[in-house]
Amino acid sequence: MENILEYNNWEDKLWALYNSIFKDASYTITDGVIFPDKYASTPFKVMIMNREAYDEKSYSLNQDGIAKEIGEGIIPFKDQITLRSHLRQYLSLIHLLSNKGFNEVSEKEVIDFVNQSDNDDLVYYLSNAAYINIKKSDGKKRSVRSDLKEYAKKGIEVLKEQIRFCNPSVILGGDVCYNIIDNLFDWGEELYGGDGYNPVKIYELVIDGKSYPFIDMFHPSRTQNYKDGDEKESMSMYFLELFKAMISVEKTRPGYWSSHMNNKCFETSALK
């Protein structure tokens, strides 16, 4: 209950800031932590950062939206099959890796675990996560990078505050980095895939001197094949690229992911 009260009090301040910046928005879809108590108690905290909420009815991304749907037995993103399927895969993988300490997991074990997951598992994983969009109002069904970047630049303090207060163990960025937020945040070390093309890259995003692991991925709604070297691969197997990337970081920096487990959240804020 204490976590819920802390989060609610902070959220009131956050959206007051947002509304003071985007005064002319025709609608706003608030986002963030879905269940504050569950997020606070989960050892490895995942924040999903996607582009924009283009449909006021399809997206409702915090405890006032998805949480109510889950409580009523409604499947989140029920009309967005690709988004739902890929999020389930990525969150299933991270759940498995964090439970195993990010080592001693075979590719076969990953494939079996991810493929047997279902909508009930998605509900469980989302219930422990945070979900935010770069653009929270007046979205477009077809994203335009210049529009998203302009919006992100204007609302950068809102995004920073959401990350700062939620203190995630990892941020899954759905194609929001290149030419959108890449020049708006400070960045630390490139942990994986920084040289040339790679279907997954891992950086450290820096706010107030604190580093947050940031995974630069394709958007979970993507349906086209992707390149892995000279080969084209189906997005249905893209979760293996995420697996390869996270394990590579762990091998080169033993204990890296474990050092981001059990983060304290809902404590650090720049809002008065």
Question: What is the meaning of each model-derived region?
Answer:
Residues 2-9, 146-160, 179-272:
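C-terminal capping/extension of enzyme domains
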Residues 46, 169-171, 213-214:
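Hydrophobic beta-strand segments of well-ordered beta-sheets in folded domains
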Residues 53, 135, 176-178, 221:
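Catalytic metal-binding/acid-base residues of hydrolase active sites
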Residues 132, 174, 218:
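Active-site flanking residues adjacent to catalytic metal/cofactor-binding acidic residues
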